[in-house]
Amino acid sequence: WASQVSENRPVCKAIIQGKQFEGLVDTGADVSIIALNQWPKNWPKQKAVTGLVGIGTASEVYQSTEILHCLGPDNQESTVQPMITSIPLNLWGRDLLQQWGAEITMPAPLYSPTSQKIMTKMGYIPGKGLGKNEDGIKIPFEAKINQKREGIGYPF
């Protein structure tokens, strides 16, 4: 599973004890939280001994009495003892994300900051092609060495 940061929230599915849930990937949450209205009535829960900070004021906070088996979005095996409260959507916290091997990466730019500034001053808009109608090549291509040892591409 992969998601590029955009205006859309990073949401993925997980299967807990055989039941599918959808939740928001939340790297700022220490623990995973299941929305009270999605918690199966026959699954045991208990009043939580600790409150939840950072999600506003939650009057009823519960925790699963059991450690539950979970499959991540790419069938990663994990376990979770989620908190349960009245929130609009489930949150997958670092307790699960770490077990799933989640990573946050910021790839290095393809071009130097100087070349990016020059291109921007020339009217280049990221994601658009070059040319009058902005329909030219949108991704860079790699120069290949000419193996015939003649013409452009031959290393001198």
Swiss-Prot record:
The active site is at residue 26. Residues 21-96 form the Peptidase A2 domain. Signal peptide: none annotated. One of its GO terms (molecular function) is nucleic acid binding. SUPFAM superfamilies: Acid proteases (SSF50630). Keywords: Aspartyl protease, Autocatalytic cleavage, ERV, Hydrolase, Protease, Transposable element. Active as a homodimer. Belongs to the peptidase A2 family. HERV class-II K(HML-2) subfamily. PANTHER family: GAG RETROVIRAL POLYPROTEIN, RT1 CLASS I, LOCUS CE15. This is Endogenous retrovirus group K member 24 Pro protein. It comes from Homo sapiens (Human). The lineage of its organism: Eukaryota, Metazoa, Chordata, Craniata, Vertebrata.
